[in-house]
Regions:
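N-terminal non-catalytic structural scaffold regions of very large proteins
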Residues: 1-268
Length: 269
């Protein structure tokens, strides 16, 4: 696999024009999200990540994450004069002037034709869960919504995400200015080898999630039919077992990975 949580740069061709791209595979607790910052044909920065159809304007997304002023956004990217020139063009194209308007811009992209309250909640949920999820480790584990300090913790994580996006934008501009080369995806420094422990961790997580969904389905079906709820009938033993044994036997692991090329004979001699 490509290294997680590491900024990588590359070129792409679109409509016979070169697009400069900085991307990162952000991974946290088994969830892996591709976040891309690119400089489009109009020389404007755009961001894409899971759950968002299309692209979001970079500056407006930064405002949604808590950087309200243009000065703060520029500081998060770079103080270099050449990069500042590029950033001025992005600032002029921005349509948001506050954190609230930035969140509503994201919400309208995610849930068009919905109520403002729903759009705001949806935008905050996506920003907190799908944008750069590896930075969510900064959030205290036992802190819940409504607890003292929860709002401050959420805001600090969003600011961390904004500054990480700033680093990605700087990498993109450095590529434009020939200050850095594109990253070699085949170089060993950009690769990570998943061994048995990592594969088993991913496999067990997915298998357990499937088991819990199956238990929920069995209990809901029994409840609808007014039957007595029984753990023996709700928990099917083969769901977890078969899900674990099949990849071990065939080598077809989760995520399309392949390993062992033949069936293993499990005879204990």
């Amino acid at each position: 696999d490509l290294a997680s949580n590491k900024i990588m740069t590359e070129f792409t061709e679109r409509y016979n024009e070169r697009i400069y791209v900085a991307k990162v595979f952000s991974q946290f607790r088994g969830y892996r999200a591709l976040v891309v910052v690119e400089r489009n044909r109009k020389n404007l920065l755009e961001v894409s990540f899971p759950s968002v159809a299309g692209h979001l304007r970079f500056v407006d997304l930064m405002k949604a994450l808590g950087l309200a002023s243009d000065h703060d956004i520029v500081e998060a990217v770079s103080t270099d004069e050449e990069i500042l020139t590029f950033m001025m063009q992005n600032l002029e194209e921005s349509e948001c002037d506050s954190v609230e308007s930035g969140i509503m811009y994201v919400g309208k992209k995610l849930a068009p034709n919905q109520t403002r309250d729903y759009q705001k909640k949806r935008a905050e949920f996506v920003l907190d869960n799908y944008l750069l999820p590896h930075l969510n480790y900064l959030m205290p584990a036992n802190l819940k919504e409504g607890d003292p300090g929860y709002r401050a913790a959420v805001d600090s994580v969003r600011l961390a995400k904004a500054h990480f996006l700033g680093r990605m934008a700087e990498s993109c501009f450095d590529l434009v200015l020939n200050r850095r080369r594109i990253d070699d995806k085949d170089h060993y420094a950009n690769k990570r080898l998943k061994l048995a422990g990592d594969l088993m961790e991913d496999l067990f997580r997915i298998s357990l999630n499937r088991l819990t969904r199956d238990i929920k389905y069995q209990l809901e079906r029994a409840s609808m039919r007014h039957r007595d709820l029984s753990i023996a009938t709700a928990v099917r033993a083969d769901v977890l077992t078969e899900r674990l044994l099949h990849p071990l036997a065939t080598g077809n692991w989760v995520g399309g990975r392949t390993g062992v090329s033949q069936l293993l004979d499990r005879v204990d001699h």
